Structures are given as structure tokens and as C-alpha cells.
A protein has these predicted regions:
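Alpha-helical transmembrane segments and membrane-interface helix-loop junctions
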Residues: 1-164
Length: 164
């Protein structure tokens, strides 16, 4: 069961990371398009600014699961190095519970925002509702839950590699 969960978690986390990378590429392409239309053609495309903002929102919330999976979000590396094996597991459990609590708030509030955003339209793209921007929060949160639990079952200690 644990092996199956970790396999599913790996696939979903990888998919969310690929999606986050695609959103970053989209934001960069739209930014270039906006510069060309505004400064070269002198005909600004207002919708690009909104789409850049939304693609960056999606990039962040879909990239968070990988950060949780790599152990880079909530790190207690100093305590982890000083603690014995038993205390390390207690620390891992506390970090997991705290992370899941935070993500639960993001999921609940994000879902509420999404439902409220159904009646709002996106400025510059009036045919679309704000639901599509806000749904990134609960969706990224759900993927993050899998990453958090996956890191608990199969810890990855990359805090020193990801530190500046």
C-alpha cells in the first residue's frame, strides 16, 4: 500500500511540476508578446497582463507540491541534526501535521474563493470567470497533501542543497 501511494504521489507531483513549468513558459511567452505589441506595434494587448498574472498564480500553486515533496518548505534541519532517531520521527510528524493544517486552510479558503469567483469576470477576458484563477489554490493544495504525506513516508532531506 505504501509503495502504491508513493508511486501515485510521484506521478501526481511530477505532473504538477510539469504543469508549473508550462505556466512559467506561458508567462514568459506572454510577457514577450506584450512587449512586442506594446512597444513595437504600439497596440497593447491588455489581456496578456491578466494572463501573465494568472499563469504565475498557477505556477506557484502547482509548484508547491514538489517543494513539499523535496522537504524544502518546512525545514527544521538544525533540530533534525541534533535529535536522536526517535526525536527525528517526532519532528517529522509535527512538521507534517503543521504543513497539512496550513494546506487544509489553503484548500478550504481557496475553494470558497473559487465558488465566490464564479460570478466575477476576468478584466480583459470577460467571457471567463475568476473561478479559473482561484481554483489553483485548492488544486495545488490537494497535490501538496500528497507531497507532504509522501515526504513523511519517504523523507527527502534536501534543505542543505536548496539553502542559499
Amino acid at each position: 500500500m505504501k509503495h502504491f501511494f508513493l508511486r501515485v504521489e510521484h506521478m501526481t507531483t511530477l505532473a504538477s511540476m510539469y504543469f508549473a513549468c508550462a505556466m512559467l513558459a506561458l508567462a514568459a511567452a506572454l510577457g514577450l508578446f506584450q512587449i512586442i505589441t506594446r512597444f513595437v506595434l504600439e497596440e497593447p494587448a491588455e489581456w496578456t497582463e491578466v494572463m501573465i498574472r494568472f499563469s504565475l498564480i498557477w505556477m506557484v500553486f502547482m509548484g508547491i507540491p514538489m517543494a513539499f515533496r523535496q522537504g524544502a518548505m518546512v525545514s527544521v534541519d538544525v533540530l533534525h541534526r541534533w535529535a536522536g532517531p526517535r526525536m527525528k520521527r517526532v519532528l517529522d510528524t509535527v512538521v507534517m501535521i503543521a504543513s497539512l493544517s496550513l494546506v487544509a486552510v489553503i484548500i478550504i479558503v481557496g475553494w470558497d474563493y473559487s465558488l465566490r469567483g464564479k460570478v466575477q469576470t476576468i478584466i480583459g477576458l470577460e467571457e471567463y470567470s475568476m473561478f479559473w484563477a482561484y481554483i489553483a489554490m485548492p488544486l495545488g493544495g490537494l497535490f501538496s497533501v500528497l507531497g507532504i504525506i509522501g515526504n513523511f513516508f519517504d523523507p527527502v532531506r534536501m534543505e542543505l542543497e536548496t539553502a542559499l
